[in-house]
Each structure stands twice: as structure tokens, then as C-alpha cells.
Amino acid sequence: MNARRTAFLGGLALATVITGSPAPRAQGIQINPFSQYYENVARAAKQNQAGQVRSLIANGGYPDQTDDEGRTGMHYAAINGNLQIIAILIKGGAKLDPKEKLGNTPLHLAADVNQVEAVKLLLDVGAAVDPDNKNGMTPLMIAASRGNVEIVQALLAKGASVTKTDYTGRDAVGWAAESRHPAVVQAIKRAQSAKKS
């Protein structure tokens, strides 16, 4: 047992002796000085602790709890490509499209770090395909800028808009071209042609 925890527990015992009242836990109040670390769904997901995420939610942990960046467990599971945690969070009632401080959803972030399977799972369970972040960027624009053809194709298959533009006026093709990803440009143009025919 570490010194901080020992001191805390000793303090509870001393308070009981001084006041004659039982410790707060015995009265139904759960005091845990380490709760910010151990009982935070977002942090457990960030650290890829699937068992901890499951346990926290099963014991009443809020699945959409946010950290200082406004990110939830779903954001971190998407970034990490942790399909198990995504599934646990979905089962626990977590939102699919929460926005963090910059307006990014889990789908934005999964696309940004090339987590193909996380993108596909989020799309399959009904994540919004075209949300804008604070810069007006959609997951398709982000995937296009990263050059990930597989993610671009997955987004297009779910109906991602190729005509939406961000605050600079660039669309997904513009981002792919500027980032020198000709394969992405071709994939988007093929999808546009297929829609027209």
C-alpha cells in the first residue's frame, strides 16, 4: 500500500475516533482519493484497459465522461483502434458522435490516425459520416489529406459528401491533391462518376 493511500485511510480512522462517527464509506458515501485516476472511463480507454472500461461501466461509470480535451472513451478507443473497447462502450450506451474541444468526433480521429478497422466499425454501427469539426473538416477530408484510400472508400460507401468544403473552401479532392495523394483523388472521382451513372 503506498504512502498516500495509507495516509488517507489513517485519516479516515482518525476522523472516526475524533467524531465518533463511522467512516463515510460505511454511511454509503464512497470516498476514493484515487477516483480521478481509477474511475475515469476516458482515461481507462486511453490506456487500452478494456477490462477496466467494462468494470467501470458495469459499476455505474459514465461512458461519455470527458477529459480536459473534451474527449470521451470513444474518442480514445477510436484513436487506438481498440475495437474491443469500442464494442464495450457501445454496449454501455456511449454516444457514437461526441465532439471534443476542436469539434472532432471519434470518426474524425480514427481517420486522422489511419485506424481503418475502427472507422469501419464506427460506420457500421451508425456513426454520422459527415460531421464537421470546428474547421469545417469532415472525416472524408481528413482521410483524403492522410492519403488513406481504404478509409476514403469506406466513408464514400456510407455516403460521405464529396462536395462539402471546410473554412478554407477546400473539399476532399482539394485536400488529397494538396497533400499529393493521387490515388485518393482518383478514388473520389470514381465514386463521383459512379453516382452520376
Spell out what each predicted region is:
Residues 52, 84-85, 117-118, 150-151, ...:
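Conserved ankyrin/ankyrin-like repeat signature
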